[in-house]
Amino acid sequence: MIDYMEHVLRSFEQCTGWNRDNSYENVTATSENLLSFRVPSGVKFQVSNKSTPNTFTTFELSNNKVINGSLAYLYTNCQGLENYVSNSRDILLQEASETYRQIRPLYPCHSLRSSSDGAKEFGPSSLWYGRMYYPTSTLEAMVVSRSSAQTQFVAKCISSLANASVLTLYWQKDSGQNCQEWVASTNEGLLGYRILHNFVGSQSKLNTSLYNDSSLSVGGELWFGVLNTTPACSTTLRYCTHSANTGKPLTLTLSWNPLFGHVSSTYSVKTSSGATFSSKYDFNLYSIESNLSFGCDLWRRGHTKQLDQRRTEPLDAPNTNSSVFSKERVQKKQGPKEDSPMFYHLMAGSTSSQKLIEDLNVTFASSLQKLTKEKSTIQRFENSLIDANFASVWKLSTSLRHKNLRVLWEGKYKGFLISAGAEFTGAPLELPSNLAGESKTPALIRPGKFGIQLQYST
């Protein structure tokens, strides 16, 4: 379950027009949400409050062998943020839970419109966040600054009495088709560069679908530790598309780390509006070791309720998990305009020209009908996800190499966001040192950790 402060940060990004899915850091977010979801450990209780439209506070208390607590405060000068931040009673479960990330292709009209409108509508905004942990007296701070529509500066700092303080700076530039990121950290003098390039969607000869709703992205990262002179790098390919017959989205990724010889491929598909399946295969070229992981989530619907009308975006805007396309529903209800031919603006010519236009319309009529059908099928499936009021979700993942099973339940009850789960492992039991050499304890399926987390916000 997403913490309240993380929800405010994502709402800030959405309000300022920043797309977190167009970053190399989140290029494999879908498979990670389904396979490597976080299972709570111990008992954690979190209470949050929006005291003013620009200030937010959170108090957290946890009990994992010892009692810990934290107090967080967030301030932002972003205008209109209250339209995106929801309390625990009103927030949709698919927005509060980490799940499948829907990626829409970015066409040239999007970047042109964002650049022209951004100069008129965009206003610089900033976000300040701080959290103090007790009893360790560890301080966590973050500053996010949006100076222009395409740039973002992020500074993160952790100060602790027991360990050395760490300061990390991020400078990000997102032009739509390319997203570049420069990173500098005081931890080992780490310097990094990330880039993600989106290939503009176009009709492929190998693609039999007329309505091309696919997205192909290729990115990489370079890291270098100045103090220990250690390099690191990786590259990833991501392909997102929809089934033309059912409208169901799927995502494929292929990652490669040439220094360590690690190759990873993932396949994630939303089989229905209430079920998602993901698989991952890892292979090392040097050690010849491999691993196969599976994960899924199953959603249960609750009572139907009317969505908040303020969460609407234009039809031709890039899609995110929380986007709502009100104009799509209006056009879908109205239906296509059958009386308007394809080249109606050229019908005022001669008789021979009109005959030629009529022949063209007859020739391409079947193709146009197929395009409209495929587009409406995809949009109908997306609208079913946006309009759904889910009450709970079950998440499961397993790994053949590690022989573990993760189980997580997330839901809403009486205004509370509840997350409860356990991780079962097949590792052998640890024996005392005086009995370690006598016999081997057989591996048993036992809970490695379990816990529950409750969140309440107003």
From Swiss-Prot:
Main location: mitochondrion
A biological process term (GO) from this entry: establishment of mitochondrion localization
Metal-binding keyword on record: no
GO cellular component, one term: SAM complex
Record's compositionally biased regions (Basic and acidic residues): 326-339
Lineage: superkingdom: Eukaryota
Membrane topology value: Multi-pass membrane protein
Pfam families with a match to the protein in the record: MDM10
Chain intervals for the UniProt region annotation (Disordered): 307-339
Record's keyword terms, sorted: Membrane, Mitochondrion, Mitochondrion outer membrane, Transmembrane, Transmembrane beta strand
Subcellular location: Mitochondrion outer membrane
Entry similarity comment: Belongs to the MDM10 family.
Subunit-level organization: Component of the ER-mitochondria encounter structure (ERMES) or MDM complex, composed of MMM1, MDM10, MDM12 and MDM34. Associates with the mitochondrial outer membrane sorting assembly machinery SAM(core) complex.
This protein's domain notes: Lacks alpha-helical transmembrane segments, suggesting that it resides in the membrane via beta-sheet conformations similar to those predicted for other outer membrane proteins and porin.
Role summary: Component of the ERMES/MDM complex, which serves as a molecular tether to connect the endoplasmic reticulum and mitochondria. Components of this complex are involved in the control of mitochondrial shape and protein biogenesis and may function in phospholipid exchange. MDM10 is involved in the late assembly steps of the general translocase of the mitochondrial outer membrane (TOM complex). Functions in the TOM40-specific route of the assembly of outer membrane beta-barrel proteins, including the association of TOM40 with the receptor TOM22 and small TOM proteins.
Name by which UniProt lists this protein: Mitochondrial distribution and morphology protein 10
Encoding gene (name): MDM10
